[in-house]
A protein has these predicted regions:
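Thr-Gly-centered strand-to-loop micro-motif
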Residues: 22, 47, 284, 341, ...
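Terminal RNA-binding accessory module
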Residues: 354-450
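Glycine-centered loop/turn positions within well-structured domains
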Residues: 121, 172, 217, 279-280, ...
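Proteins enriched for Cys/Gly/acidic motifs involved in redox and nucleic-acid/cofactor modification
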Residues: 1-217, 255, 270, 292-303, ...
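Conserved SAM/AdoMet-binding glycine-rich loop
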Residues: 90-94, 99, 104, 203-324, ...
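Short flexible coil/turn linkers enriched for glycine and charged/polar residues
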Residues: 156-160, 170-172, 266, 276, ...
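Conserved, mostly hydrophobic/aromatic
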Residues: 174, 194, 211, 244, ...
Length: 450
């Protein structure tokens, strides 16, 4: 008789408590939910209390230097915690683990486990390595891993919205970006597992899913491309809202826009990172599109969905950026009229093409000034966008009690704008019709239409 040796050994967790902190993008949030699922299967118990934890995992981001500096600071705090609890196991997982394995495993960091984004299945074994007195390390990248069959443990307790990772990795190699080096090549998850996960969420009361990938538009398994996947998920129920992030402008197809326009429960919001408004700058960034191409895609979005929100990412002070190129970014912002933007100073990342070949030659004070100008303009654009919504009516999916008052609820429009309104008899998870009566640059305020 064949016996599975692993089935005979005690579970690694044996009731030990796991605490996880997540930094960075939505993909990391989804990854943390996968990690908790893997660890619970090994007998670990998830806790939201750091003080109760026997093992702490920090899921990290390497997209900018300040993201990594936050982690180093957090590690210092964890080392102080260990003085009170010497048995505490500390692990660094995710992109920073992949990028900085050597530094993290040096003496004095306090790190016991280092695990990259493709090695989460190995975490129980890495804990056993630590139990045996060694450091547990696995940062091997995979060409196949998608964690497709693992049911994530939903850590956001609102029970309304959930993330579903549909692919991993990136093949674009933008010159400034570390992601292809920390997350590996693109791999698309089997479509049926994605649809099954979305259906299970809906049956369990969730009313919104966000399909995640570094570039969702390049998703493909067999005959199923991203527009087809989006359609199939939306067909689960008209009561299930479907969002996605993130899109690469070079891959936004008319087929996708037609699919979005044809199905009311596919949210009318597209995150379309521009990074710069200058074609020459975009060439240095290896973005594979021009300003003219980007604006044509924006025009197509408006043509198919006049009410679609468009948001973006912008970088101030990339290598060799001239004042004219900076002004081109400001003019692009005005021409598009973004509803919202994530805006950053350029942070050179070791190992990227830009670091190896272009340098980081824009003075910090110039970067700061240019970023300030971008932020000030976007604040005006966001406020103008919100003011245009005053008097309009939207269907809101209620997500939570408002931070302003327990007597108010908040939820988002299809365009991903947050709306605050009086609670009345409504509950989290309800769809509510709201008329917008006022706004700030970040929030809409409304009244329920009976």
């Amino acid at each position: 008789m064949n016996v599975n040796i692993n089935s005979l050994r005690p579970l690694t967790g044996s009731g030990r408590k796991l605490y996880i902190e997540t930094y960075g993008c939505q993909m990391n949030v989804g990854d943390s939910e996968i990690v908790v699922s893997i660890m619970q299967q090994e007998g670990f118990r998830y806790t939201e209390s750091l003080e109760e934890a026997d093992i702490v995992l920090i899921n990290t981001c390497s997209i900018r230097d300040n993201a990594e500096q936050r982690i180093w600071g957090r590690l210092s705090e964890m080392r102080h915690m260990r003085k009170k609890k010497p048995s505490l196991i500390i692990g660094i997982i995710g992109c920073m683990a992949e990028r900085l394995k050597e530094e993290l495993t040096k003496g004095g960091t306090g790190v016991d486990i280092v695990a990259g984004p493709d090695s989460y299945r190995d975490l129980p074994r890495l804990v056993r390595e630590v139990d045996g007195g060694a450091t547990g390390v696995n940062v091997e990248l995979s060409k196949e891993e998608t964690y497709a069959e693992i049911a994530p443990v939903r850590l956001d307790k609102n029970g309304v919205s959930a993330f579903i990772a549909i692919m991993r990795g990136c093949n674009n190699y933008c010159s400034y970006c570390v992601v292809p080096y920390t997350r590996g090549i693109e791999r698309s998850r089997d479509a049926e597992t994605i649809i099954a996960e979305a259906r299970t969420l809906f049956e369990n009361g969730y009313r919104e899913v966000t399909l995640l990938g570094q570039n969702v538009n390049s998703y493909r398994t067999g005959e199923v491309d991203f527009p087809e996947l989006l359609k199939r998920v939306a067909e689960i129920s008209p009561l299930l809202r479907v969002r996605f992030a993130t899109s690469h402008p070079k891959d936004i197809s008319d087929k996708l826009l037609e699919t979005m326009a044809s199905m009311p429960n596919i949210c009318k919001a597209i995150h379309l990172p521009a990074q710069s408004g200058s074609t020459e700058m975009l060439k240095r960034m290896n973005r594979k599109y021009t300003r003219e191409w980007y604006l044509e895609r924006v025009e197509a979005i408006r043509r198919y969905m006049p009410d679609c929100a468009i948001t973006t990412d912008l970088i101030a002070g990339f290598a060799h950026e001239t004042e004219e190129e900076h002004e081109a970014t400001l003019s692009l912002m005005q021409e598009v009229g973004y509803d919202f933007a994530y805006m950053f100073k350029y942070s050179e990342r070791p190992g990227t093409f830009a670091q190896r070949n272009l340098g980081d030659d824009i003075p910090e004070d110039v970067k700061t000034r240019r970023l300030t100008e971008i932020i000030e303009l976007q604040n005006r654009l966001s406020e103008e966008s919100n003011k245009r919504d005053i008097g309009k009516e939207f269907e809101i999916l209620v997500e939570c009690t408002s931070k302003r008052s327990d007597a108010q609820l908040s939820g988002r429009t299809s365009q991903n704008k947050m709306v605050v309104f009086d609670r009345g008899n409504h509950q989290i998870g309800d769809y509510v019709k709201v008329r917008i009566t006022g706004c700030s640059s970040a929030t809409l305020f409304g009244e329920v239409i009976i």
